[in-house]
Amino acid sequence: MNRLTGKYTLITGGSSGIGLATAREFIAEGATVAITGRNKDRLLAAKQELGADVLILQSDTSDVEEQKLLAAQLTKMWPRLDAVYINAADVTHLPVTDWNENTFDRVMNTNFKGPFFLIQALLPLLADPCSVILCGTVSTKIGLPQSSIYASSKAALCSLAKTLSGELLSRNIRFNCLVPGPTDTPAHMNLNTTDPDAVKHLQQEIKALVPLGRLGKPIELAKAAVFLASDESSFMLGTEILVDGGVGNI
């Protein structure tokens, strides 16, 4: 199918996991794709897999100045952006007693502050119409231990689906939140926790929460992202789509 033919699309955090799977699907649907990531080697590996036409841009989502530079680079190279997927994230999970200010700021800067200022910087490039997809987390729906700051940062991000949809209604820019449940990705495998036993225990605890009894697959999120990026979702804004195995509702 060619549901994204002619569309210029940006995926942050596109070198692995859900972002990479989404880039594959966007390309298969005819989109022109740019991906970002912090790690140059991973970006180059992703480009080798995705093809020479994919634009790779090294960028640290937590750095506001780098987000402004990213927007400036895209503005020079592309005529517009038809869809943006804010996917890059810091998934650090820690007990409430173990958080310090530096780790708190890193998670908030990556998951909320950086994305907000990227959106701001991209506004002149966003097409009419445009779809902006914000990657949330089902942890905002439940009381998952150790997810306090991660879930809070994602709740802040997804609140933009409503506030910015309302504010930018005249521009025909639609913001929606795509909410993954526990998904089999590299991020899920480490959770930015250094204690291997703690990681294993937390992974088991998370998997046990899923009514369907398994982790999600990145392609399952990617298919939902294609829908939100396409004209098929043109009557949707300010809302959430949960692809979570039932965690948030059952």
Residue ranges with predicted function:
Residues Y8, S15-G17:
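Conserved glycine-rich cofactor-binding loop
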Residues P95-V96, N100-M108, I206:
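Substrate-binding pocket helix/loop in short-chain dehydrogenase/reductase
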Residues T97, P129, I142-S148, S170, ...:
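Active-site loop immediately N-terminal to the catalytic Tyr-X3-Lys motif
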Residues I119, S153, A161:
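Active-site helix of classical SDR
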Residues P124, G166-S170, S234:
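Alpha-helical segment proximal to the catalytic Tyr-Lys
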Residues T137:
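Residue(s) in the substrate-gating loop at a strand-loop-helix junction
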Residues V226, L237-I250:
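Short C-terminal tail/terminal secondary-structure segment
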